[in-house]
Amino acid sequence: FGVVMGHFSAITPKKDPEQIAASKGIPIKGFKEVYSRFENCLSAFLSHHTLWEKCVEDNEEYMICEHDAVFVNTVPLFLAYDKVISLGKPSYGKANLPQSLGVNPLTSKAYFPGAHAYMLKPSGARELIDRAKFDAGPTDIFLHRDRFPWLQEYYPWPVEARDTFTTIQKTKGCLAKHYYNDEYKII
């Protein structure tokens, strides 16, 4: 679909995510929950956070895709969104369908239905960074319309998460995933 992506080396538990979070002023209590492994979840959030910082520093619009993001349709070249927009089809649980084609308020869930594919502008990245200093948590849940009422999503979703493994969730966190089955790996 003509999307050329760069590669970002993720923050992993081996890189001491608690120290990195402390250096950025990010509280860690929101990452201690029943669905994910603490250090892995924190590391994933910090990877996204680092890209938000780069977005602000570069003063450029960014598209962030996780390893399991698969493009199934074209993303419009000029997408008229405000600050942050999800491109990803919900990857777990039930979801609502947006009411119109194109850019919509975040409708499928109250939070991003997975953080596997989204775009953001420097102004949106700045707001995410600032809010993370108060109540950070798992990336998709952090991107919640109660925190950021301006979040949007594009429909029909041009990106799907086609995951066969997780390095973040515990078994309980995988049960609602659309691709979860007997062969799904928790690494």
Where are these regions (language model features)?
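An acidic/histidine-cluster motif and surrounding catalytic segment
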Residues: 1-65, 69-187
